[in-house]
Amino acid sequence: QIFSTYIQVNYNDYKQAEKLLEFVKPLPEDTDKIVTYDLVVSTNTGFSTTECTSSRNIDIDVKKNYNDDLPYDKYKEFCEKDGSGLALMFGIPGSGKTSLIKKLIYDCSDTNFYIMDFSMLQNIISGQFLSFLLGLRNAVIIMEDCEYVLKRRDTHENPLINSLLNITDGLVGDALNIRFLCTFNAAL
């Protein structure tokens, strides 16, 4: 509308004005894409999920915004495959891990994604939590900021990491068929 007023005032040739208007057309208002995922929450009666959406930083160009050695296709394949497993994503704070995860959620639209705080794994020994996880079969669970589990396993007993490995690689993992994608705010 601003351009329209400006052009009408400064041009007597309306055909030229229309050409200029076509050239300076505003972008569509809704250019953002939306991703949908579920947040795992603890309640008084157990565990449940709440649907969440995000529309920020989804349409990123992986080749343009990340290093050449980023294995995006491997992360995508991991999220789309059938089975259990564990994938790790390392990077300093602000390096784009969360944006990359949103891109994965968008690109793998046939996969169910759940966001879970890593501390919830403390509940893994409870039958109630295991029953809850059975309801999430063939999904990807994303846990961000897992760096505190990087303690040396030979000097400290770490039941959380042992439970995570059991869920993703043991017989329990075969039954659950869940893949975990964990991020760490650390450089390799």
Specify the residue positions occupied by each region the protein language model found.
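A conserved segment at the C-terminal end of the G1
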Residues: 102-108
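Short glycine-rich substrate-engagement loop in P-loop NTPases that contacts/grips substrate
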Residues: 108-136, 158
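Signal for well-folded cores of large energy- and translation-related assemblies
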Residues: 76, 80, 109, 134, ...
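Walker B catalytic acidic pair
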Residues: 144-146
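AAA+ P-loop ATPase mechanoenzymes
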Residues: 1-70, 77
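Loop/turn-to-beta-strand initiation segments
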Residues: 111-112, 136-140, 174-181
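Conserved catalytic/switch belt of AAA+ P-loop NTPases
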Residues: 148-188
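Walker A/P-loop nucleotide-binding motif
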Residues: 82-100
